[in-house]
Regions:
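N-terminal ligand-binding/catalytic initiation module
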Residues: 1-91, 95, 102-104, 275, ...
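Flexible, glycine/charged-enriched surface loops at secondary-structure junctions
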Residues: 2-4, 40-49, 73-76, 113-128, ...
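Structural motif
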Residues: 4, 11, 39, 45-46, ...
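Conserved active-site and cofactor/substrate-binding residues in soluble primary-metabolism enzymes
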Residues: 19-30, 53-57, 61, 92, ...
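Glycine-rich phosphate/diphosphate-binding loop of Rossmann-like nucleotide-binding domains
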Residues: 87-200
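Adenosine-phosphate binding glycine-rich loop
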Residues: 108-109, 224-370
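Rossmann-like adenosine-cofactor binding region
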Residues: 160-249, 254-255
Length: 370
């Protein structure tokens, strides 16, 4: 993804639902303290980001505890990402991974060499999609895909699933889920869960835990395209089975990279101490307004009011973050596509992406003389 933002993985083995908010805060602050003791959290060393079981509150506690331990650190806000806006977060971080998944699918459907391999058209509107997971990633991916015409026919969660062959109303389901904390009682609810991974559909998006597609169910997968929105949802054995079946898999380290891309944007914002758009928003508005005035003068017609507001508006932080994310997802997909089609030895997108990554590391070692 061409981000100077490498890092590591770490976790606390607890169930957040088993602890109240005060207890979670205490646990998080102690965890931050232990990381700091080992020099494992620092704006220039290791910058944690949100993952399963965390939210803006958790990231805010980490940030505040780090600043308490390092009161003179000028870049302290950049020690962690996924923070609330009021604590140095960036607009668009919550939706970032799900939006990145949406952009990945959009890119796939731009390349006829890719989508024609599995009998797809370039249209999103005729695609039937099954999504496993309805957290930040699953919800935002589902919402954007539905907004652009795709049919979300099944959403799978840990307590059951919702099925509607005509397409689920994602926003209505989200409101219900937020209120009830379960799908139970919603139209189309069933207690069946992972069996729906093998449901007849065009696109399958596993957006939850690891290894949900394995050698035991891979042969029954009917989706032609799998987009790995979660980390490691397809085991190595399942991967081989699916490739032999002709299924295309868009790998996790590209498909779900939207989160780390926007975390990088947040980190840069914190280091620069300025929000995105601050230096250009009003200048853009002025220039666009002058352009609209010139068009009205030249044509003798008034620009429609509802269009004028949209055209004249300068780029806000959320506009720039979404634009930057889309560009990074475009760049990433293009590289994978080109590598896959340029080397007959490469049989799948995952291998193509790995070859690109390993070559970058090899080149770095070569030029550094290591």
């Amino acid at each position: 993804m061409e981000l100077p933002f490498g890092g590591s993985k770490g976790a606390l083995i607890i169930d957040p639902n088993a602890w109240n908010k005060k207890e979670l805060e205490k646990i998080t602050r102690r965890f931050t303290s232990e990381l700091a003791k080992r020099n494992l959290i620092h704006p220039s060393q290791n910058v944690p980001a949100p993952d399963m079981g965390t939210d803006e509150n958790v990231m805010a506690w980490i940030s505040d505890e780090y600043r308490r331990l390092n009161p003179t650190e000028i870049d302290a806000l950049a020690c962690v990402t996924g923070k609330p806006i009021s604590m140095g977060g960036v607009y668009g971080r919550i939706e970032a991974t799900g939006r990145g998944v949406f952009y990945a699918i959009k890119e796939f459907l731009k390349y006829s060499k890719d989508y024609k391999r599995i009998g797809f058209t370039c249209e999103l509107s005729d695609k039937r999609i099954v999504i496993q997971g309805f957290g930040n990633v699953g919800y935002h991916a589902a919402s954007l895909l539905a907004e652009h015409g795709a049919k979300i026919i099944t959403v799978i969660e840990k307590n059951g699933s919702v099925v509607d062959e005509n397409g689920i109303d994602i926003e209505k389901l989200k409101k219900y889920f937020n209120r009830k904390k379960t799908f139970e009682g919603y139209d189309g609810f069933t207690k069946t869960r992972n069996r729906f991974l093998t449901k007849d559909c065009d696109i399958l998006i596993p957006a939850a835990t690891e290894s949900v597609i394995h050698k035991g169910n891979a042969k029954n997968i009917k989706a032609k395209l799998i987009v790995e929105a979660g980390n490691g949802p397809v085991t190595a054995e399942a991967d081989r089975i699916l490739i032999r079946k002709g299924v295309i898999i868009i790998p996790d380290f590209y498909a779900n990279a939207g989160g780390v891309v926007v975390s990088y944007f947040e980190w840069v914002k914190n280091l620069s101490k300025m929000r995105y758009g601050l230096m250009q928003e009003r200048e853009e508005e002025k220039k666009q307004s002058q352009l609209v005035d010139a068009l009205e003068l030249m044509t003798g017609n008034n620009f429609p009011k509802h269009l004028r507001t949209e055209v004249v508006k300068g780029s806000t932080e959320i506009d720039l973050v979404r634009s930057g994310l889309e560009e990074k997802m475009r760049e990433g997909y293009k590289k994978i596509h080109e590598k896959y089609h340029s080397d007959k030895k490469i049989k799948d997108f995952r291998t193509a992406a790995m070859v690109i990554a390993v070559k970058k590391i090899a080149d770095a070692y070569k030029y550094l003389g290591i």
